[in-house]
Amino acid sequence: MINNHSKNNHNNKNSQINKNNIPGRPAKSNVTAHNEHSVDTRELALEMFIEINERGAFSHIVLRSVLDKYQYLSKQDRAFMTRLVDGTIEYMLQLDYIIDSFSKTKVRKMKPFIRNLLRMSVYQIKYMDAVPDSAVCNEAVKLAKRHKFAQLSGFVNGVLRNIARNIDSVQFDTLSIRYSMPQWIVDRFVAAYGEKKAEEIFKAFHSKSTISIRTNLTRCTPDELRATLEAEGVTVTAVDELNYAFVISGFDYLNGLQSFRDGLFYVQDISSMLVAQTAAPKKGDYVIDVCAAPGGKSTHIAELLQGSGHVLARDLTDNKVDMIEENIERHGLNNMSAEVWDATVPDADSAGKADILICDLPCSGLGVLGRKKDIRYKMTPESVDELAALQRQILDTVHTYVKPNGVLVYSTCTIDEAENEDNVRWFIEKHPEFELDKNFAEGTGMKQILPGEHGSDGFFIARFIKSKL
């Protein structure tokens, strides 16, 4: 049974995680320390991939930890490692299919080190044209020998050279293999959206991810932020739908930007920014965010309040609340506080106090599979059902916090009906004092954003009004 209902920043909010793997703080990594003058980027990438794939670590945590540790590496080396790890995760099912097509020993029967070495090598052969196939094969053999698999180095060499010679002949006849997506997810999306739309969604997952940011309006104007970023050498593109949002590129890492350290902006997907906009806080409003970490939506609301009112941001653990408090401090927000609170536990003191209640709840993350690539392998149909039940439990607990005529915003980063529309229907039926806001989303009161729309992740938002006593 899934019982960790705090958000894990990778938006696959249900997963049980090691306490050391808390987003926003350095993770204890099993990746071997390397001497500064002898870093083999392929070896380091392979060690990261093994930790993610064989030990269940979250890819974004492992990558961030290692990239922070090896900041002295060149921008090119850091980019190479990131692409190699992310790409191998993204295409893992397809890579296994290719390997199984050319190897008598199937992937599932290989030693973990060898199968992951082959996966990463085949990714380079298939998707990294700048890397010569001969170099891929030679480096893989060296790594096998270095890690005491000399007896299998010939096998590694033979399989990879055979694949390199014949890679263009491999056909991917199913959506699952073509887009490296577990069959149950393919079946679920096809049933919900039809095969054509499902394939468009899968294509969107494989499109290049962008980094979107919103201006901290308490510290600067959008024009001032743009000028500051451009002075730092960052490429800045405006977002048509939101005048305070930009897409940025052309920089090495965020902590290297003084503007980020000064709290002039917050990194947030465009769809997530719509939560605060949907909440539409008014001057003096009291807002409760029940599952707030790392604090993106609640800090956004606090900024829109322009120093008035108050935002109380809650989450399940001290580590989560520490993240929120770090963002409060970095953004200089005096009208916001954070505290530890389990959203499934009723709080009598909060009953009837909230002008706005934000319920951005733990979810399957099936809308962000392009950005958080390992979710597809961690999630199961059973865990989706458990999460939908958890969402209902939390809604059932916290709805009492809303004042009469107050607003409840329910949001997820999934595009799964069981967690979205089904929960909305259930909530209205059980709590008839709440109605969908007919002034939101063309009269429907709820909005499903599919991956790729507006250049954003998949997301769902519903706006309720507590209109009856």
Question: What do the predicted segments below correspond to?
Answer:
Residues M1-L469:
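S-adenosylmethionine
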